[in-house]
């Protein structure tokens, strides 16, 4: 999401793309004064690209069509991941749990994603995670350790 947003900001800045509220919100957050300054921060590794996703959600909630398109594309990608999982597991009766603030918290993106899942994959049940991410990582590490001959 962040990478696509920065691409949109770059295109808006040099005239290859439409103006977007993402530019204004990012300028305000970075106190940069210009899209060129933001691009310099990206190239100098002084900008956490993933953090830009929250700005995209904010812009979408304000009705910015570029932000809405970015989130729509990314929600489609997550639905495609679920479809791939359905194919690999040969079942469409799955529970799906979200992890991460972008989709855990109620916002434009999480609502859009849930709506897309419900409309395209009606047998999928969205559930709360049984464990926090760290708990899941520990459980996975324990399973991997056991499978390679370690003590579990």
Each language-model region and where it sits:
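ATP-binding/phosphotransfer module of carbohydrate and carboxylate kinases, centering on a glycine-rich
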Residues: 6-152
């Amino acid at each position: 999401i962040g990478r696509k947003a920065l691409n949109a900001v770059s295109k808006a800045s040099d005239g290859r793309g439409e103006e977007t509220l993402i530019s204004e919100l990012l300028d305000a957050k970075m106190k940069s004064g210009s899209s060129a300054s933001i691009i310099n921060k990206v190239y100098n590794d002084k900008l956490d690209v993933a953090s830009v996703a929250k700005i995209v959600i904010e812009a979408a909630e304000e009705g910015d069509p570029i932000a809405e398109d970015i989130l729509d594309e990314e929600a489609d990608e997550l639905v495609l991941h679920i479809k791939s999982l359905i194919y690999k597991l040969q079942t469409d009766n799955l529970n799906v749990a979200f992890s991460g603030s972008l989709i855990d918290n109620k916002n434009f993106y999480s609502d859009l994603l849930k709506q897309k899942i419900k409309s395209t994959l009606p047998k999928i049940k969205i559930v709360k995670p049984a464990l926090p991410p760290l708990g899941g990582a520990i459980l996975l590490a324990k399973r991997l350790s056991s499978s390679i001959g370690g003590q579990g």
